[in-house]
């Protein structure tokens, strides 16, 4: 049977991690279909159909799909599920809200946050805050799986021409209503998809000192991250938190400043391509995953770093 991917989008555009999810889903079966649920989402459906790995797109439209409400989306997927062996979506806020409802309705065990497809029924997922990995084999006829998108490369975004089939929507779930959306506007790259992330920890000592992190991020056109300790101390808002209970990031460059490296934080960033750590404690766990480490007082090292960055006129923004 085929694989069904639940595409994440904002009606006009596909969310970037959808391309990573397509790569993961295609490794389970080459007959990959994708469903897109929304309102006036024709443009996103067309872009989905252009992904070479997608063989068919199912488009479901209604006004009550304008905004994501898991109680409205889940019945659509459950109805389609009879034709598929695997139901896939990303292990982010979207997937963590949606997939448990689908799995419960299908009476199947969910396999969460996989980082590798070993075979069509066996997957690898992290446990113990990423310090160990467990292969999981599912014998369920219907497999509900969430994937860690940062563990898979994005697929090619053009060259495909999958047919688009429109399907009738399910009725609106009246016990849950979308109230409002609150978005934080920023000119910075999004933390979850940024090429460069500069993060600060409790070693910053205050919210005012986080201006040093901002200065470095400005020079590198980077996203700003933080450890949970920095967030709990009130130095920065929790939407910047990186780690097991925050965002998982895999940038090309991750700069950790004043972060000791608790296992919960390492779980969210240790797969970064290059890791640079700056900490005055030479025994800090962050150095165990760092490609480059500087044992120094950050309040001396970072101003010098900023000064050197100011001298470089070749940095592209």
List each language-model region with its residue ranges.
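N-terminal glycine-rich FAD/FM-binding segment characteristic of electron-transfer flavoproteins
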Residues: 1-317
């Amino acid at each position: 049977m085929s694989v069904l991917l639940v595409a994440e989008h904002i009606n006009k555009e596909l969310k970037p991690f959808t391309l990573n999810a397509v790569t993961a889903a295609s490794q389970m079966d080459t007959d990959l279909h994708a469903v897109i649920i929304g309102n006036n989402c024709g443009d996103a459906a067309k872009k989905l159909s252009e992904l070479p790995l997608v063989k068919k797109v199912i488009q479901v439209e209604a006004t009550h799909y304008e905004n994501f409400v898991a109680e409205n989306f889940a019945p659509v997927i459950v109805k389609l599920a009879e034709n598929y062996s695997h139901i896939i979506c990303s292990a982010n806020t979207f997937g963590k809200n949606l997939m448990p409802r689908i799995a419960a309705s299908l009476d199947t065990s969910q396999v969460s946050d996989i980082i590798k497809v070993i075979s069509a029924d066996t997957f690898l997922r992290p446990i113990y805050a990423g310090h160990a990995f467990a292969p999981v084999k599912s014998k369920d006829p219907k497999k509900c799986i969430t994937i860690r998108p940062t563990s898979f490369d994005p697929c090619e975004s053009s060259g495909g021409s999958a047919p688009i089939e429109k399907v009738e929507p399910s009725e609106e779930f009246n016990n849950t209503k979308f109230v409002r959306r609150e978005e934080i506007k920023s000119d910075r790259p999004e933390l979850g998809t940024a090429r460069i992330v500069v993060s600060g920890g409790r070693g910053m000592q205050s919210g005012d000192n986080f201006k040093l992190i901002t200065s470095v991020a400005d020079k590198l056109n980077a996203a700003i991250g933080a450890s949970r300790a920095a967030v709990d101390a009130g130095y920065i808002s929790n939407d910047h938190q990186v780690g097991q209970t925050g965002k998982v990031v895999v940038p090309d460059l991750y700069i950790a400043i004043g972060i000791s490296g608790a296992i919960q934080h390492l779980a969210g960033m240790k797969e970064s391509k290059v890791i640079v750590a700056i900490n005055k404690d030479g025994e800090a766990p962050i150095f165990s995953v760092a490609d480059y480490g500087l044992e120094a007082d950050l309040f001396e090292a970072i101003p010098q770093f900023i000064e050197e960055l100011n001298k470089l006129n070749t940095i592209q923004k």
